[in-house]
């Protein structure tokens, strides 16, 4: 029978090991991403030109100077060619913003002997790694409710810092679900957690987040024990996060029913996600983190491609 | 009490609690094991589930069994179980006669015998019956029935006797006792030996009483008999009473002071008799005075040896030279044949310049000169001194002796001789007269067929009769003897071959020689210093006991009532003269419990209707602590198992368990291969190679760089040695003094690396042994650059001091300029290596004698076992094949490399040739060369 344990509260806090793990994973992922690029060959990432003048790097057009404008904006080289004054306009370029949320509730501290690491470690590593990957690709990443969108190179350290500060300040248990604030249109959300809350709450949360048209991805981190229910004999189950105990005389008798309920729970979440055009990825801590990262990246890219198309449509 | 098992309980009532076990079984069965606590995040999903079968799983049957066994153990332990509880003897119905075989055969199990007898006497006391304890050794003493308490006291005073008693005498006493008290109960505690009377005794007591119980130990009885000191070794017969029991064992040989000299193993191989052999040098064999079977405490298992069992070493010189061509014509042939059974004969090598002296140097106790006429001056003096010091000189007449004259004869001889029965004589060959009382040959039968046809004659001086040991029927002496100093000169007036007499063909000849040889110990003891020629009684009429064995085989003062044995007594021990030594010290005669050809046989008592009881050997064993320990272990196992089942035993993970199983397996399987290895300890090919070729060796320090330089240095030195000297050494080898055998290497180079750990104690001990056995170790501290004279010791010096702590290092001195090591091949001043400033320390030579004869080279008695230098010799030697030094030298130069190599050559030559070069033979050459 596999054994399971909860991490100590202290041990579960965001720390150096998560930064290190995330950076290593992202590094490793660069090699994996060669394969990923072939899958998503058509998808480009980075800064996306908006086909109109605005803040950006690349040249868009020269336009005549309008009096009242700041003189500093005059492009003197072009203006010297004739008598008129020109202003150099650049194409408006905007990066996508991805909001990341990492569940740090008590149930995430669960780890069994079948798992490679506790769920929270896996979630933090995944979240920080995807942030690093995005920033290196030119996108902006934000920790939902904690940081503004950032594109600094040291995104992992910044995020980790923000997480640690919140953990140090927070007096109560972190929530199992993020606050239902609407995300801006065009933004994407990456929610990493075990999503063991009631499907109705999850559905409400998704709807709240996507109220302004944001898309999102749920990454469900589960322990292999939660998937397979390999218990036998006289066993007393102790709730994690939720109060309650359950004494099973013969644990193996619960297995089939539990597995059915788990599948139903998943299906409910997936339905809620699909309704808002969100995606759901199930990741087991018994598997390496790269799997989840690859899947998540592909989904992010396809989503941003779709988003770009959606944004271009009104222009053309 | 269980009849079939020797198991009893102190409180049998407690066993009733065992009935509660089924109840416990039910209780345990319905109490489930403690649930495993399992945190489970998706617990919400489980709420409200109602599985079909949710009865708690029950305690597994094996755990139940374990607990029941633990409880059963406890209950049985509380009942006070006793294994082998002493059972009460049956109470006798009539007066009880306890007949106790108390010969030596009963000694090994005496305590149990006494305890069995006591048990019966106790029973008799309880039933208020009179009793008698009758030891067999008591013989036909009248049996009086007394109070069992008194009988017990008497029993406790009994000790096993060193001889076997006469049972028939006891049976008579029993018969007469039975006439007075009818129908006695008889208990016979027998030793199981049938020494001629067991069957009859059994029948007779069976006739007396209908209630005969016999207790026998069933033990196999071992004994020694008939030790013989043969030419090849000392042989002793080992006997046992039954062809059962352990077939192998050890006979130990002890000397007079009780020190162990040797052990010999024996193996019965199913038979009842075998032989143990001590193949020792004769000097050691002659020291043996007592043989005993190890682990067998009885007088029968002890064999005492006296002077008669010693073998003498006899030097034999004969005048003949071509003995081997016609052996029957040579006197030595007859002498060898006659003496070989009881003495070792040494003959001088054919090439020996002076056979007499060489044999005397061989520590012969008796010298026999067969017809040797003239003994040369030096040999004569040596012989005279030999006789003065207690040796026996036996001479045989012959043509040489008849024509010569010397004073190493007991009586003056008439020149010429006397021929009887020859063509020119008128008398028939004479026969021997019976021996006189004063003669050591007294008592030997004189066979009729011995005739003497020729002899040398003694001058009829006064006192000749006293010197005569044997004479012809007409009174002319044939054997004369005279004391000289502490020794004895014996002259046979006839030859040792058959030309003058047929005495050498008779058994008398052997007996006479034997008597003479027996005298040798006496004379060498030097007990008395009688003047030459004085008559003396060679044997006392009777020998008083000096020390006797008790029943357990220990020597002690003889008990009262032991009678002296007559002189010449050679039978086995009897009650009136138990085994032991008789006679004065130095001349004592050993009497043993068993005669030389005696055997042991077990008695058989089938068909007599005796009740037989075994002699209980093992005492009662209280099983309580064992059972409690077992219960404790079982409960501990139960606790561990319960913990494991509820998942709280983390460390008892499968991996750990597998490790434990492997470890157990390794422990169980481990010793087998190692014992196989020790069985066949082969010589490693490396040792074989080292033994076949002389090679230089170095101690691997473990520092790779240093070891490589050392190896290169020794290779270079070996190359130079092969090129310049007659020594062609093999490739140098690295040795580990702790592991490798060092004795193959004359020279061991040991570079000191202070950073390496000290070698184990065994390595230092082996190095010390190597130095003791004549090896030389060159310690090179390689620190000549860092060391300052008078300054603190360098780390290397400290390391070396640590190493040599506890090693017996001789006194050292700086290499003196005239030390032989500086002259053995080249003339050098110092051992130079990579550096030149260091001093070589070597074993201090004896100081120059005060008369001051200046010698160019001095040497001690042996090679210095240790040389300590700091010049890094190996680095100085190391060169490439073309002779270029591999390392930069300090101060440097081609010359220094050459001098270093020369020092190395000298060093090797010194260890191989020792002080040879200090010989005066070379002094002139050395002086000449020193003058240049």
Where are these regions (language model features)?
Chain A
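Exposed, interaction-prone extracellular/peripheral surfaces
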Residues: 2-51, 59, 64-72, 78, ...
């Amino acid at each position: 029978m596999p054994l399971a344990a909860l991490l100590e509260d202290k041990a579960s806090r965001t720390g150096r090991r998560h930064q290190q793990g995330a950076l290593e994973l992202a590094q490793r992922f660069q090699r994996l991403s060669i394969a990923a690029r072939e899958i998503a060959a058509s998808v480009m990432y980075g800064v996306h030109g908006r086909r109109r003048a605005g803040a950006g790097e690349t040249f868009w057009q020269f336009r005549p100077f309008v009096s009242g404008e700041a003189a500093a904006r005059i492009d003197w080289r072009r203006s010297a060619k004739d008598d008129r004054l020109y202003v150099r306009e650049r194409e408006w370029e905007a990066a996508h913003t991805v909001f990341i949320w990492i569940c740090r509730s008590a149930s995430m501290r669960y780890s069994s002997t079948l798992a490679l690491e506790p769920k929270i470690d896996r979630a933090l590593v995944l979240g920080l790694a995807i942030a690093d990957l995005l920033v290196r690709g030119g996108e902006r990443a934000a920790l939902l409710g904690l940081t503004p969108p950032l594109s600094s190179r040291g995104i992992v350290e910044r995020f980790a810092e923000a997480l640690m500060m919140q953990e140090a300040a927070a007096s109560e248990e972190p929530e199992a679900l993020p606050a239902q604030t609407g995300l801006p249109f065009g933004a994407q959300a990456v929610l990493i957690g075990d999503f063991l809350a009631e499907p109705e709450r999850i559905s409400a949360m998704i709807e709240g987040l996507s109220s302004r048209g944001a898309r999102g991805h749920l990454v469900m981190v589960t322990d292999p024990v939660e998937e397979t229910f390999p218990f036998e004999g006289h066993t007393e189950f102790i709730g994690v996060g939720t109060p309650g105990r359950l004494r099973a005389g013969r644990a193996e008798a619960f297995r089939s029913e539990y597995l059915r309920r788990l599948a139903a729970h998943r299906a409910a979440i997936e339905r809620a996600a699909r309704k808002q055009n969100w995606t759901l990825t199930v990741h087991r801590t018994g598997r390496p983190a790269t799997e989840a990262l690859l899947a998540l990246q592909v989904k992010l890219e396809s989503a941003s491609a779709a988003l770009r198309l959606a944004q271009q449509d009104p222009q053309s | 009490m269980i009849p079939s098992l020797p198991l009893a309980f102190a409180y049998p009532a407690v066993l009733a609690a065992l009935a509660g076990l089924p109840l416990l079984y039910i209780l345990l069965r319905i109490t489930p094991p403690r649930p495993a606590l399992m945190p489970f995040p998706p617990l919400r999903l489980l709420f409200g589930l109602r599985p079909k079968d949710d009865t708690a799983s029950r305690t597994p049957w094996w755990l139940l069994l374990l607990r029941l066994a633990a409880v059963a153990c406890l209950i049985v332990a509380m009942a006070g179980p006793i294994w082998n509880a002493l059972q009460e003897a049956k109470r006798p119905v009539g007066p009880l006669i306890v007949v106790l075989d108390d010969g030596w055969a009963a000694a090994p199990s005496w305590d149990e015998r006494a305890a069995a007898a006591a048990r019966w006497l106790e029973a008799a006391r309880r039933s208020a019956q009179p009793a008698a304890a009758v030891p067999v050794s008591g013989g036909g003493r009248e049996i009086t029935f007394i109070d069992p308490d008194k009988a017990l006291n008497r029993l406790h005073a009994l000790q096993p006797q060193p001889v076997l008693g006469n049972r028939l005498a006891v049976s008579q006493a029993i018969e007469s006792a039975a006439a007075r008290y009818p129908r006695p109960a008889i208990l016979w505690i027998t030793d199981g030996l049938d020494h001629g009377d067991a069957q009859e005794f059994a029948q007779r007591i069976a006739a007396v009483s209908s209630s005969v119980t016999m207790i026998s130990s069933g033990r196999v009885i071992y004994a020694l008999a008939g030790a013989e000191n043969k030419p090849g070794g000392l042989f002793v017969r080992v006997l046992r009473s039954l062809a059962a029991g352990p077939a192998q064992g050890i006979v130990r040989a002890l000397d007079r002071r009780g020190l162990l000299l040797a052990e010999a193993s024996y193996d019965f191989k199913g038979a009842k008799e075998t032989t143990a052999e001590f193949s020792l040098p004769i000097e050691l064999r002659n020291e043996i005075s007592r043989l005993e079977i190890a682990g067998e405490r009885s007088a029968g298992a002890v064999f005492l040896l006296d002077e008669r069992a010693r073998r003498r070493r006899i030097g034999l010189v004969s005048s003949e030279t071509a003995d081997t061509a016609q052996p029957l014509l040579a006197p030595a042939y007859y002498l060898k044949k006659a003496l070989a059974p009881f003495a070792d004969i040494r003959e001088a090598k054919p090439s020996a310049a002076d056979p007499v002296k060489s044999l005397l140097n061989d520590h012969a106790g008796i010298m026999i000169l067969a017809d040797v006429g003239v003994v040369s001056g030096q040999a004569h003096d040596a012989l005279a001194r030999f006789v003065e010091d207690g040796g026996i000189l036996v001479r045989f007449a012959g043509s040489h002796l008849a024509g010569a004259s010397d004073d190493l004869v007991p009586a003056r001889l008439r020149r010429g001789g006397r021929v009887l029965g020859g063509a020119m004589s008128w008398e028939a060959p004479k026969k021997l007269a019976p021996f006189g009382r004063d003669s050591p040959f007294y008592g030997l039968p004189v066979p009729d067929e011995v005739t003497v046809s020729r002899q040398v004659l003694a001058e009829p001086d006064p006192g000749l009769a006293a010197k005569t040991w044997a004479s012809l029927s007409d009174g002319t002496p044939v054997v004369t003897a005279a004391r000289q100093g502490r020794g004895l000169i014996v002259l046979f007036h006839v030859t040792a071959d058959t030309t003058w007499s047929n005495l050498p063909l008779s058994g008398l000849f052997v007996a006479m020689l034997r008597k003479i040889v027996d005298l040798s110990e006496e004379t060498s003891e030097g007990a008395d210093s009688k003047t030459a020629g004085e008559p003396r009684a060679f044997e006392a009429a009777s020998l008083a006991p000096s020390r006797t064995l008790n029943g357990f085989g220990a020597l002690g003062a003889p008990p009262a009532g032991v009678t002296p044995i007559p002189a010449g007594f050679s039978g086995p021990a009897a009650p009136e003269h138990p085994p032991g030594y008789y006679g004065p010290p130095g001349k004592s005669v050993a009497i043993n419990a068993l005669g030389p050809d005696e055997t042991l046989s077990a008695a058989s008592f089938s068909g007599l209707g005796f009740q037989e009881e075994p002699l209980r050997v093992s005492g009662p064993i209280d099983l309580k602590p064992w059972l409690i320990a077992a219960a404790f272990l079982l409960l501990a196992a139960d606790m561990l198992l319960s913990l494991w089942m509820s998942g709280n035993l983390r460390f008892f993970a499968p991996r750990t368990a597998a490790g434990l199983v492997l470890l157990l397996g390794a422990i169980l399987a481990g010793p087998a291969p190692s014992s196989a290895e020790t069985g066949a300890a082969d010589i490693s090919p490396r040792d074989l190679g080292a033994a076949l070729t002389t090679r230089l060796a170095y101690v691997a320090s473990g520092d790779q760089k240093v070891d490589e330089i050392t190896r290169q240095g020794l290779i270079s030195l070996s190359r130079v040695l092969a090129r310049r000297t007659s020594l062609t050494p093999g490739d140098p080898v690295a040795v580990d003094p702790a592991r490798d055998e060092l004795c193959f290497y004359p020279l061991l180079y040991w570079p000191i690396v202070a950073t390496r750990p000290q070698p184990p104690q065994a390595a230092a001990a082996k190095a010390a042994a190597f130095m003791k056995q004549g090896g030389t170790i060159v310690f090179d501290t390689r620190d000549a650059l860092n060391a300052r004279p008078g300054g603190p010791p360098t780390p290397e010096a400290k390391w070396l001091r640590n190493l040599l702590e506890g090693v017996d290092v001789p006194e050292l001195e700086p290499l003196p300029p005239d030390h032989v090591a500086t002259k053995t091949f080249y003339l050098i001043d110092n051992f130079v290596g990579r550096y030149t400033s260091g001093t070589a320390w070597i074993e201090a030579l004896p100081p120059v004698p005060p008369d001051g004869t200046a010698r160019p080279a001095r040497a001690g008695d042996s090679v210095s076992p240790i040389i300590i230098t700091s010049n890094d010799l190996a680095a100085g030697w190391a060169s490439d094949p073309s002779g270029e030094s591999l390392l930069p030298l300090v101060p440097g130069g081609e010359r220094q490399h050459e001098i270093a190599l020369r020092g190395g050559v000298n060093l090797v030559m010194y260890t191989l040739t020792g002080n040879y070069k200090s010989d005066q033979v070379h002094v002139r050459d050395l002086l000449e060369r020193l003058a240049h």
